[in-house]
């Protein structure tokens, strides 16, 4: 009997029930149960086992005898990775596997746009299909717990609602277009240092309300097809064999019907992993190959367990039409439609932190622009450890400005300004490096500074493009601090003495210390690792073609010690003398030593990010949700009404400026008489609104009452607390000019 894969459509939408999100629409993964039962009945035990581990670096096997195609995985949540050799990390060097470099996760989150998240998933799906892929290894949706996190650039935000809504729409965008997603990294992979062996100790409430929430939303509201188990341990158990996380919560409570795969090299056992909920070991068969076959034949693992894992795989396989191998990689991947999506995300992600009048650039006054900084010309599609994109092209900030002012009387000149920090320079120099080479580096750095100063003196405007790069922010290790590398603080001070008219552009993925930049810049923008079209988007914002509309997806602290985990002394943990990383060792073909031990104490509990700063009255440098505009917005006429199972928050938003622009309105809720410990306020709704100059709109943001529940650790379930609630509305977590009170009495009873 031959079986063909079927094309299915995801059901868009969803509702909330019993204080957690759910989807009452049909789940495409459960539409072929009888057919799957028949397929499993035809399979041998060996064929079943062969599906449960990596066939090569980025695929797991199907069953050729039954015409069941392999599942092909697409690495990289912000662009489809180049094709690799079957059993190594070496590139195949094809001419057709370039891809669009989409803005990274923190950039997408800075759009605060569910529409952009959907388009992002759609764009990723289109390119994955051209490459013959079935499942995107993304989105990466771990909460940004620490400012120094190595993968903060890849993750979304510090807030579970913002991360969850974006994850839901990314998932829908991809799966509506016949490409599965794999949510990662489940769960509590919130640091890179020691991630391969660290044991996370977290309260049940914090785990449920903060860290699991984005995963739960994407599973329940978008029927995510895949989940990747994280490297770390939670409460003493590896995530890849964690019965509580994988069986009880993910499948038992949330109703997940897809596949659970290990992170690469992140499987630690055969029997425990098989019984603990792991479906696929990647990228090899160390535990789920012959060892698993032997366990089944010995009666240690029931064949029914194997059948259920195969069922999970076949559900995904039948929901996602396979691309015939002869059609994959036959044309260049990046297409104009995806490039346009990359531009739209980038242009909406740019955050204006400060503006003293230099922006937008006034070409009546500005004729000579000095662009200074290595990041003005540096490509960010690759670098460091982990996923990168073989981008067909990447418009740098300098190229974007040159194109924007091409054919005008504005002259643009460039100076490097500083030597970039490379991976090798982050470690102690080896003894073979001579004093003369150190002297050469110092002399070159000083020469670059003097060239930058000279150029600044001649210019009407200085655009300093600094920040981090992908060598500084990288998988496998967290940053030691949030100080700008390469002596950028000293450089900006020297430039300011030569020319005070400075616009600073920070190309970053995570928070940095901007105190010196703030003091020496008239205007500051955050432009992120912003993809193939990042330079064009930045130039359009600088020139005033569009108004900046991004909002910070995380808090910028004044100093690192203000952030919760650092303040409480629970991060960084004491590292082994020679710390190892499971992924880095896998790439280097070196055996990972999992016997190393460390604990991560989440002592801040639910007080992550802005929840901490607001509750502890610690002023940040720039708050969560902050972002200015070239327009001016006015909030007024707030009303809040309970409407059946939701709170409808209505207000008027006016653009009283002279430029068309977009604003992200944010709704926070305070519970002033709560019997439990709560943050000063929590984000419960947001909406991006486009307004023409002088335009006014009535805005309504609906908040499901279930979203106001908290996790009761005594009852081990969601609980709705009655009593007063203060609704706060504004443009950031610290700028909330409107507030009103409602009474939540006899309005909702959890099922």
Label each region the model flagged.
Residues 7-15:
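Bacterial N-terminal signal peptides
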Residues 16-713, 717-734, 749-750:
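Glycoside hydrolase catalytic-domain context in secreted enzymes
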Residues 735-751:
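Short beta-strand elements
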Residues 1-6:
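Bacterial N-terminal signal peptides that target proteins for export
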């Amino acid at each position: 009997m031959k079986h063909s894969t079927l094309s299915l459509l995801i059901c868009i939408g969803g509702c909330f029930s019993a204080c957690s999100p759910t989807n009452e629409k049909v789940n495409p993964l459960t539409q072929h149960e009888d057919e799957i039962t028949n397929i499993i009945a035809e399979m041998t035990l060996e064929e079943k086992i062969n599906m449960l581990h990596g066939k090569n670096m980025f695929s797991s096997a199907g069953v050729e005898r039954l015409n069941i195609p392999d599942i092909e995985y697409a690495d990289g949540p912000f662009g489809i990775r180049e094709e690799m050799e079957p059993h190594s990390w070496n590139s195949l060097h094809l001419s057709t596997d370039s891809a669009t470099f989409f803005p990274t996760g923190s950039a997408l989150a800075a759009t605060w746009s569910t529409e952009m998240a959907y388009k992002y998933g759609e764009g990723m799906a289109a390119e994955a299909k051209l490459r013959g892929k079935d499942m995107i290894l993304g989105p990466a949706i771990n909460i940004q717990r620490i400012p120094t996190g190595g993968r903060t650039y890849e993750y979304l935000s510090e807030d579970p609602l913002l991360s969850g809504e974006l994850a839901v729409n990314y998932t829908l965008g991809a799966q509506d277009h016949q490409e599965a997603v794999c949510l990662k990294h489940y769960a509590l992979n919130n640091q890179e240092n020691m991630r391969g062996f660290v044991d996370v100790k977290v309260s049940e409430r914090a785990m449920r309300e903060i860290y699991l929430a984005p995963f739960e939303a994407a599973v329940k509201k978008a029927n995510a097809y895949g989940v990747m188990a994280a490297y770390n341990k939670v409460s003493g158990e590896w995530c890849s064999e964690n019965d509580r996380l994988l069986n009880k919560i993910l499948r038992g409570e949330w109703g997940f019907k897809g596949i659970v795969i290990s992170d690469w090299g992140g499987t630690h056992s055969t029997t425990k992993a098989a019984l603990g909920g792991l479906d696929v070991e990647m990228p090899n068969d160390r535990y789920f190959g012959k060892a698993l076959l032997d366990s089944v034949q010995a009666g240690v693992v029931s064949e029914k367990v194997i059948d259920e894992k195969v069922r999970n795989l076949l559900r995904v396989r039948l929901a996602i039409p396979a691309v015939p191998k002869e059609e994959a990689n036959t044309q260049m991947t990046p297409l104009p439609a995806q490039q346009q999506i990359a531009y739209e995300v980038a242009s909406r992600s740019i955050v204006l932190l400060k503006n003293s009048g230099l922006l937008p650039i006034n070409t009546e006054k500005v004729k000579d622009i000095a662009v200074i900084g290595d990041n003005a010309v540096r490509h960010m599609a690759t670098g460091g450890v982990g996923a990168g994109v073989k981008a067909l092209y990447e418009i740098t900030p300098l190229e974007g400005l040159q194109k924007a002012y091409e054919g005008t009387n504005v002259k643009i000149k460039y100076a490097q300004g500083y030597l970039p920090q490379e991976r090798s320079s982050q470690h102690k120099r080896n003894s073979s490096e001579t004093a003369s080479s150190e002297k050469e580096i110092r002399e070159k750095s000083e020469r670059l500074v003097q060239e930058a100063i000279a150029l600044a003196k001649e210019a009407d405007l200085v655009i300093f493009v600094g920040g981090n790069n992908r060598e500084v922010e990288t998988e496998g290790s967290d940053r030691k601090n949030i100080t700008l590398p390469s002596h950028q603080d000293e450089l900006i001070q020297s430039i300011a003495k030569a020319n005070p008219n400075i616009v600073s552009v920070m190309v970053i993925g995570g928070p940095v210390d901007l105190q010196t930049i703030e003091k020496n810049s008239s205007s500051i923008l955050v432009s992120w690792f912003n993809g193939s079209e990042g330079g064009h988007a930045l130039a359009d914002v600088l020139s005033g073609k569009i108004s900046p509309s991004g909002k910070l997806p995380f808090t910028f602290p004044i100093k690192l010690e203000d952030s919760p985990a650092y303040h409480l002394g629970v991060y960084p943990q004491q590292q082994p003398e020679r710390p190892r990383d499971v992924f880095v060792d896998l790439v280097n073909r070196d055996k990972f030593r999992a016997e190393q031990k460390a604990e991560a104490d989440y002592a801040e509990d639910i007080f992550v990010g802005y929840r901490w700063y607001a509750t502890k009255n610690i002023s940040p440098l720039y708050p969560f949700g902050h972002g200015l505009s070239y327009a001016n917005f006015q909030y007024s006429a707030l009303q809040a009404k309970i409407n059946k199972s939701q709170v409808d928050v209505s207000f008027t938003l006016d653009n009283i400026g002279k430029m068309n622009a977009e604003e992200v309105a944010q709704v926070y809720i305070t519970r002033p008489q709560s019997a439990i410990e709560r943050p000063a306020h929590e984000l419960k709704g947001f909406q991006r609104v486009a307004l023409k100059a002088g335009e006014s709109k009535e805005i309504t943001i609906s908040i499901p009452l279930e979203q106001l529940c908290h996790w009761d650790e005594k009852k081990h379930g969601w609980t709705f607390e009655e009593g007063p609630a203060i609704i706060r509305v504004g443009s950031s977590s610290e700028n909330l000019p409107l507030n009103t009170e409602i009474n939540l009495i006899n309005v909702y009873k959890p099922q």
